[in-house]
Amino acid sequence: MKAIIAMAQNRVIGKKNGLPWPSIKEDFKWFKEFTMGKTLIVGKNTFDTLPLLKNRECLVLTKQVEAIDAYITNQYLVNNNAMTGQMITMEDIESYSQFRKDYLIVVGGAKTYVKLLPYITEFYVTHVNGNYDGDTFMPEFEHLFAHQEVVKEFDGHKVVKYSK
């Protein structure tokens, strides 16, 4: 499976359930292009902050099914290995990723990235130019990937593809 993230030089990825840096229009455009038509895996806190993502299916990882069950429509809910209306496990996600690896993308937050890091074969990281104050950080992961390649550059920021 793949993952996509934006990260400041000091590894900050969030602040108060949002992005700590000013809006980067080109990065939002890149995110939309990269995720369009795909199945996204997202943690509940991150899911709560996202706008409606048209033409994308979401698998929401949470321990609090009742907190979001009421307003999920046309989305699947993964609740500690149980999907609403259907059982699903982390093994199911791993199996699903083997068959649909080009269609399954982890989009955050930090706990979700860490939990699914063993399954991620390609990690697309927008390296945001600068250091920012934040309360959510991405731990080091680069050592898990053998290759890295700059795939996009805009406004002083670089998108690097890390692959195994």
Predicted regions and their residues:
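Enzymes that bind and transform nitrogen-containing heteroaromatic metabolites
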Residues: M1-K164
